[in-house]
Amino acid sequence: MKAVKSERERGSRRRHRDGDVVLPAGVVVKQERLSPEVAPPAHRRPDHSGGSPSPPTSEPARSGHRGNRARGVSRSPPKKKNKASGRRSKSPRSKRNRSPHHSTVKVKQEREDHPRRGREDRQHREPSEQEHRRARNSDRDRHRGHSHQRRTSNERPGSGQGQGRDRDTQNLQAQEEEREFYNARRREHRQRNDVGGGGSESQELVPRPGGNNKEKEVPAKEKPSFELSGALLEDTNTFRGVVIKYSEPPEARIPKKRWRLYPFKNDEVLPVMYIHRQSAYLLGRHRRIADIPIDHPSCSKQHAVFQYRLVEYTRADGTVGRRVKPYIIDLGSGNGTFLNNKRIEPQRYYELKEKDVLKFGFSSREYVLLHESSDTSEIDRKDDEDEEEEEEVSDS
């Protein structure tokens, strides 16, 4: 047995020297199953020590013995090498790596394909971009050619300038005609306003010169009216929910004299009315807003106003002074207001003086205006006579 082992060792040494490496049979079978493809030729790695080291004597003997058995029937898997040993296996990297070699080649091919694809895309894109640029350049050239032709046509003396001048003259003539037409319209409107015929005439249709009159008839616009509508006055001049027709003037004042109204019905004396506490008194049939109610049916709801006003007057020496005087104004009543048995005009102030008599509508009552310093002897006499008549009637 020892002789057989020594012969095998010698054979293995010779094969190592010749460059043929004999691997265990089990390892070769395993590699054939995993990698059916042809592996690249194994490159022999040079030994750092200079010579090819021979495996230990015990291992090749065992491997050779097992190899003889594997040649016959044995298919048992080979023993795994101890990872703790610092020695590396002398098999090339291609045999050590169990993963298929073509996977790495595919990865390299994919990496190499990317720049090729980019170049192809650029080649596909470049012709479209070049065509677009060519189209732009052609458009610019056309535009430049048109502009150059226009400039040359304008610079040329002849038909182009003549047509432009004719158009300008036609436009100027049309503008002048329109101006004349509108000036004539304005003159007509001014004449109508001066005569006083505005309103309905201002809405007449005025035909424009030239062309069909039916298509170009323009209605004249209505002029705005700046008159007072009275809406603001109604909003500000309401009392107890009723709109008052009258508004006091800026010169309204409260008098210093104590004026009074003495009403009489036929010869009967009625209670005295003191009218010096306000600047104005409204007389009418509407008791809700009237300061001095008048119950006669011939009187209006807002019949008249008794107003105090501050007015100027000239003294005896020629100087100008101011004084508060009483006035009466009719508010457009139906049956009118009478001052000393004379009807006064509506919406107009009339100055009142001492002992003036006022009557409203068809009422039989008379109102005599007096103040505190006026002579009331006649009224006192009438009162005494009335008292005597009452006593006589009572005695009889």
Swiss-Prot record:
Organism the protein comes from: Homo sapiens (Human)
**Tissues in which the protein is found:** Ubiquitous, with highest expression in heart and skeletal muscle.
- Summarize the protein's role: Required for pre-mRNA splicing as component of the spliceosome. As a component of the minor spliceosome, involved in the splicing of U12-type introns in pre-mRNAs. Down-regulates NF-kappa-B signaling by competing with RELA for CREBBP/EP300 binding. Involved in the microRNA (miRNA) biogenesis. May be involved in cyclin-D1/CCND1 mRNA stability through the SNARP complex which associates with both the 3'end of the CCND1 gene and its mRNA.
FHA domain residues are 281-344
Coiled coil, from the record: 165-196
Cysteine disulfide partners in this protein: none
Please note every region of biased composition (Basic and acidic residues): 1-10, 107-142, 213-225, 373-382
The record, for CDD domains, names: FHA_SNIP1
Which stretches are tagged as biased composition: Acidic residues?
A: 383-396
Q: List-wise, which residues carry Phosphothreonine?
A: T57
Gene Ontology terms, cellular component aspect? cytosol; nucleoplasm; nucleus; spliceosomal complex; U2 snRNP; U2-type precatalytic spliceosome
Tell me the protein's name.
Answer: Smad nuclear-interacting protein 1
The entry's localization annotation reads:
Nucleus
